A protein has these predicted regions:
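Short, charged recognition helix plus adjacent turn
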Residues: 1-6, 65, 75-92
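Base-recognition residues in the alpha-helical recognition helix of bacterial helix-turn-helix
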Residues: 43, 47, 58, 76
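A short, Lys/Arg-rich alpha-helix, primarily the initiator
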Residues: 1-23, 72
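Helix-turn-helix DNA-binding elements, focusing on the entry/boundary residues of the two helices
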Residues: 16, 27, 42, 57-60
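DNA major-groove recognition helix of helix-turn-helix/homeodomain DNA-binding modules
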Residues: 52, 56-73
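Residue-level detection of the helix-turn-helix DNA-binding "recognition helix"
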Residues: 21, 35-36, 50-52, 79
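Short alpha-helical DNA-recognition segment
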Residues: 24-48
C-alpha cells in the first residue's frame, strides 16, 4: 500500500494575506501579533501569502487565533473567512 501525497490547501495563501490586510498589519507587525518572533521572520510572511512556503502547524494555529477562526477555516478550501476579521466567535 503506497503513501498518497498530501494535498496542499489551494486557498491558504490568499486567506493568510486576507487576515493580515483585514487587520491592517505589516509583515513585521504580523510576526509580532502572532507571537512568533522566534519561529519566523517577516520575509516568511510574504512566502506564506504567495504560496511559496507553508507555515508550520503552530504558526497556522496562531493565525487562526489572531483572526478568531478555527484552523479548519484556514486549511479547508471549501470554507471562507468571515466577512469581518477578527471574527466575533470561534467555531468549535
Amino acid at each position: 500500500m503506497g503513501v498518497r501525497p498530501r494535498q496542499r490547501p489551494q486557498r491558504l495563501a490568499e486567506k493568510l494575506l486576507a487576515i493580515r490586510t483585514a487587520l491592517g498589519l505589516s509583515q513585521t507587525q504580523t510576526v509580532k501579533s502572532l507571537g512568533a518572533e522566534e519561529m519566523i521572520v517577516p520575509g516568511q510572511v510574504s512566502e506564506f501569502e504567495t504560496g511559496k512556503r507553508e507555515p508550520s502547524l503552530i504558526v497556522l494555529l496562531r493565525y487562526a487565533r489572531l483572526a478568531n477562526v478555527c484552523v479548519d477555516t484556514l486549511i479547508d478550501d471549501d470554507l471562507d473567512l468571515p466577512a469581518k476579521l477578527p471574527a466575533r466567535a470561534k467555531h468549535r
